[in-house]
A protein has these predicted regions:
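Proteins with a high burden of low-complexity, intrinsically disordered sequence enriched in S/T/G/P/A and R
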Residues: 1-3, 166-167
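Metal-dependent enolase-superfamily TIM-barrel catalytic cores that perform enediolate-based chemistry
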Residues: 2-112
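Shared catalytic-loop signature of beta/alpha-barrel
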Residues: 84, 90-93, 99-167
């Protein structure tokens, strides 16, 4: 058993990191990355994810933000169903609930949840970010400097984000 599958062990480890002064814990609430195409999650995955997040939140209380990184492995309907279950734990973000190249579906998820959507590490141009921002598909941008063309291009993207009240 490991921290990706055992919620009690994950909560114990999260509490240890909180005691060390970490202020955020990032994990995939539905387990380790396992799909290469978006998929519809089974009910068991939703139940496991909700239990997992509940136990981790109880372990860290308000000392740590919870960040969900899901690797774009869900369909929009699965992501929305999962988000509705997890909103009660007040996570800071839901990273790439659907594949980031499908901006329409990411925007659908963003409109359906109070959890801020994060994305960007797989995007390469300011034009991709402009489309994402225009559709309000994400409010937290995670640029990879090497992929977007360096500091100058990243600064341009950051300016666009600011104008759209994204970060």
């Amino acid at each position: 058993t490991d921290v990706y599958r055992d919620p009690e062990l994950a909560a114990e480890r999260a509490a240890e990191y909180a005691q060390l002064g970490f202020t955020a814990i990032k994990f995939d609430p539905v387990g380790p990355y396992s799909a290469f195409d978006p998929r519809q999650l089974p009910l068991e995955a939703f139940e496991h994810g909700e239990k997992f997040v509940k136990i981790v939140r109880e372990a860290v209380g308000g000392k740590c933000d919870l960040l969900f990184g899901t690797h774009g492995q869900m369909t929009a309907s699965s992501a929305i169903r999962l988000a509705r279950r997890l909103e009660q734990f007040d996570p800071l973000w839901f990273e790439e609930p659907v594949p980031p190249e499908n901006v329409d579906e990411m925007a659908r998820v963003a409109r359906s949840t109070s959890i801020p959507i994060a994305t960007g590490e797989r995007l390469a141009t300011k034009y991709e970010f402009a489309g994402l921002l225009k559709q309000q598909a994400a409010s937290i941008l995670q640029m990879a400097l090497g992929r977007v063309g360096g500091m100058l291009e990243a600064k341009k993207i950051a300016g666009m984000a600011e104008a759209h009240y994204a970060q």
